[in-house]
Amino acid sequence: MVDLLTGESPHLAGYSIVRADDGLSVKRRAGFEYLHKAPYLKNKLCEPFVVTAPYLEEEQDKPIHLSRHQGNELDYIISGRLRFAYESHVEELGPGDVALYDSSRGHGMIAIGGEPCVFLAVTIPGPEII
């Protein structure tokens, strides 16, 4: 992924340090801000992002858009509140809460509570969806 975004291949071996305000900005979902926190580490088994979900009043009473991608995902809430949908299940998460799930199934989220939600999202590749 980093090769496509920057033209530079991951080149760090063993470990990577990325400071609090640093990382590679990635466009994934409209309105959400994704900051890749280990873009240049070679041979990593997961992709860590700090994600900011904006609070949008117009989303609050609508069904949450569900997406799918291969593997698993772990979302750790840092600040704010998140309404998390996994297929037909809906949960509300706050600071310190964690969701770990099979991301090949429908999942989505929106910020709630009148403010953005910041969370650590770690995607872990898995088998391709057939």
Feature names for model-found ranges:
Residues K62-P63, Y101-S103, I130:
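Hydrophobic protein-protein interaction segments
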Residues G23-H65, N72, V122:
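A short glycine-rich, His/Asp/Glu-containing loop-to-beta-strand
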Residues I112, C117-I130:
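Double-stranded beta-helix
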Residues Q60-P95:
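A short beta-strand-loop-beta hairpin characteristic of the jelly-roll/cupin
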Residues S103-G114:
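Catalytic core of Fe(II)/2-oxoglutarate
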Residues K37, E87-S104:
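Short acidic-glycine-tyrosine-enriched beta hairpin
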Residues H11, N43, E128:
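Flexible, glycine-rich phosphate/dinucleotide-binding loops
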Residues M1-Y15:
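Short C-terminal boundary/hinge segments that cap the last helix of small helical domains
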